[in-house]
């Protein structure tokens, strides 16, 4: 049974649409998504990638941005059918750590995209 689950996850990973993009923590990303109910409405989300978790079968990323005076963190599954497009806009300067959780304690001007 376990072998069957692993093979299904490996097939899902191979079918991934966003495997071509090489996303690293510290990248400034723009993600285009669609809504469940209204398929015509597309939404652009921008933010700094503060963490990547690679699991068997799927990969999640966390985006952080400062919008309207409030810090927001959102997590996305890259293999999700909601995500239409991912673009890498640029990179932030600073540490070369794998996780950029130290940005939570920094000033809002450093988190703003």
UniProtKB/Swiss-Prot annotation:
GO terms for cellular component: mitochondrial large ribosomal subunit. GO terms for molecular function: structural constituent of ribosome. SUPFAM superfamilies: Translation proteins SH3-like domain. It is found in: Mitochondrion. Keywords: Mitochondrion, Ribonucleoprotein, Ribosomal protein. The keyword Secreted does not apply. The keyword Ribosomal protein applies. Transmembrane segments: none annotated. GO terms for biological process: translation. Belongs to the bacterial ribosomal protein bL19 family. This is Large ribosomal subunit protein bL19m. It comes from Reclinomonas americana. The lineage of its organism: Eukaryota, Discoba, Jakobida, Histionina, Histionidae. The gene is RPL19.
